């Protein structure tokens, strides 16, 4: 899965692309920077499918539709899922442009994608979530970042609903809960993937400091500009991780 304005498409030998709008009944992306298509191909000899743009809960879709692309990739045979996002920094040691490896998440502000009748073919009714983000994959990301000379942070990601940015009071709440970064995606997809038994890792690009931690007002343009600035490093890291896992 590829988040806001972060794409490794240029490193892939592309076999085919499929637009979400061409799949009957499939949710489509409406956010600038999210192209809304699957890209199928290879990184070296590794077969990959990339979700170039995701759908968000705040776009009005039920949470089960938000994770439908994740479910579909698992049903197509994907065994490992690399989730990325643009996030606001809660940890005051972070700077815009930093990458944060997700060690765990807090997702109590959104409905679980597992609510409702369980589909036993996908996974068990009460799945364990003590290690949502694979320790093995996290070590690989750290190793590859070190080889590339990329500074990598690590921390807890908080998913809120959006689309509005967080208030300073909400930011303080997230920090008290132990969050290091906050955003509007990713955790729900990780839950659905783990339910299906996929191995998951997640990386946040810290595109801005969360509300109340700087004098700047938040806007989506800043998110895109920061993501653009670090896109090359991001591409190098994700490509190296795909080769290594």
Question: Residue ranges of each PLM-predicted region?
Answer:
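Short, small-residue-biased leader/transition segments that mark boundaries at the very start
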Residues: 1-8
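Glycine-rich phosphate- or other oxyanion-binding loops that anchor nucleotides, phosphorylated ligands
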Residues: 21-212, 217-245
């Amino acid at each position: 899965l590829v988040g806001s304005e972060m794409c490794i498409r240029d490193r892939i030998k592309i076999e085919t692309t499929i637009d979400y709008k061409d799949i009957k009944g499939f949710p489509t992306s409406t956010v600038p920077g999210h192209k809304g298509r699957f890209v199928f191909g290879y990184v070296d000899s590794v077969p990959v499918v990339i979700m170039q743009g995701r759908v968000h809960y705040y776009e009005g879709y039920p949470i089960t539709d938000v994770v439908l692309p994740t479910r579909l990739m698992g049903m197509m045979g994907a065994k490992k899922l690399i989730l990325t996002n643009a996030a606001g920094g809660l940890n005051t040691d972070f700077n815009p442009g930093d990458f944060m490896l997700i060690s765990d998440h807090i997702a109590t502000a959104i409905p679980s994608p597992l609510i409702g009748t369980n589909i036993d073919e996908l996974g068990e009714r009460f799945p364990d979530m003590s290690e949502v983000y694979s320790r093995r994959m996290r070590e690989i990301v750290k190793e590859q970042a070190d080889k590339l000379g990329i500074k990598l942070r690590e921390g807890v990601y908080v998913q809120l609903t959006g689309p509005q940015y967080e208030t300073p009071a909400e930011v303080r709440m997230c920090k008290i809960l132990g969050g290091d970064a906050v955003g509007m995606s990713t955790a729900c997809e990780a839950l659905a993937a783990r339910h299906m038994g996929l191995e998951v890792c997640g990386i946040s690009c810290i595109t801005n400091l969360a509300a109340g931690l700087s004098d700047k007002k938040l806007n989506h343009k800043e998110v895109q500009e920061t993501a653009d600035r670090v896109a090359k490093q991001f591409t190098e890291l994700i490509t190296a991780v795909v080769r290594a896992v």
